[in-house]
UniProtKB/Swiss-Prot annotation:
Function: The physiological role of BioH is to remove the methyl group introduced by BioC when the pimeloyl moiety is complete. It allows to synthesize pimeloyl-ACP via the fatty acid synthetic pathway through the hydrolysis of the ester bonds of pimeloyl-ACP esters.
Subunit architecture: Monomer.
A GO MF term: pimelyl-[acyl-carrier protein] methyl ester esterase activity
Keywords: Biotin biosynthesis, Cytoplasm, Hydrolase, Serine esterase
Organism this protein belongs to: Pectobacterium carotovorum subsp. carotovorum (strain PC1)
UniProt EC number: 3.1.1.85
Residues of the active site: S82, D207, H235
Domain of life: Bacteria
Family, as annotated: Belongs to the AB hydrolase superfamily. Carboxylesterase BioH family.
Lineage, broadest ranks: Bacteria, Pseudomonadati, Pseudomonadota, Gammaproteobacteria, Enterobacterales
Enzyme class: hydrolase
Catalytic activity: 6-carboxyhexanoyl-[ACP] methyl ester + H2O = 6-carboxyhexanoyl-[ACP] + methanol + H(+)
NCBIfam families, per the entry: bioH
Name under which the protein is recorded: Pimeloyl-[acyl-carrier protein] methyl ester esterase
Length: 255
């Protein structure tokens, strides 16, 4: 039976689970592990089908959340980046008693642009799916480049993301397509409006995938959560601005 890659480290007493985004793996957190480890017991996970968690096919958001939750500590703070933010949010909705606090990073409850809602145009996501079957590696690289666009360290950050992908086993086209399906179809705006778990949303001011307007719209709609927009950061603020990012995480965890 397929099992998740799950690594635990750190000197703190508080469990913090880190969930990566589409196409990547837990290696993406390496630049902030040393900053977080004194404060938390860190759990870094490769999502099903990604990195070292091989043997899983494409799956729904709720199935992915259930598989991750099955290996998780009894109670934890959950931090999810991008697609991982949807997984962490789904876990908070389906098992709130196991979630002390929720942090989403450069994530949206609805990644697809809709009337009155900023996001990625659905045909762009469909285009990525089409290109995946034609040129798998180039498509993943293009997506990674989009994530760092606009930051002062864009090239360096994109190189780091690419090395994270290439150092571990690559997800299959089926798994990547399944992840894009989730990004295209998921809409947790209404369910998360009633979430009773303490909830912090972190954004990059220059993010081209999750526009900063999302932060303001959700501030109005979700009175139960707070948002912080990190200036000059794009879709991977923990890579471009690790100090500002970890300060926010530690302050929220200790509040």
């Amino acid at each position: 039976m397929a099992t998740l890659y799950w690594q635990t480290e750190g000197a703190g007493n508080t469990d913090l689970v880190l969930l990566h985004g589409w196409g990547l793996n837990a290696q993406v957190w390496q630049s902030i592990i040393a900053r977080l480890a004194p404060h938390f017991r860190l759990h870094v996970v490769d999502l099903p089908g990604y990195g070292r968690s091989q043997g899983f096919g494409a799956m729904s958001l709720s199935d992915m959340a259930n598989i991750v939750l099955a290996q998780a500590p009894e109670r934890a703070i959950w931090l999810g980046w991008s697609l991982g933010g949807l997984v962490a949010s789904q876990i908070a909705l389906s098992a709130p008693e196991r979630v002390d606090k929720l942090i989403t990073v450069a994530s949206s409850p609805c990644f697809s642009a809709q009337d009155g809602w900023p996001g990625i145009k659905p045909d762009v996501l469909q285009g990525f799916q089409q290109q995946l079957s034609e040129d798998f590696q180039r498509t993943v690289e293009r997506f990674l480049a989009l994530q760092t666009l606009g930051t002062e360290s864009a090239r360096q950050d994109a190189r780091l993301l690419k090395s994270v992908v290439l150092e571990q086993p690559m997800p299959s086209v089926e798994v990547l397509n399944g992840g894009l399906d989730i990004l295209r179809e998921a809409d947790l705006r209404q369910p998360l409006a009633d979430l009773a778990v303490p909830f912090l949303r972190l954004y990059g001011a220059l993010d081209g995938l999750v526009p900063r307007k999302v932060a303001g719209l959700l501030d109005e709609q979700w009175l139960n959560s707070t948002s912080v927009v990190i200036p000059k950061a794009a879709h991977a603020p923990f890579i471009s601005h690790p100090d500002a990012f970890t300060e926010q995480v530690i302050a929220f965890a200790q509040a």
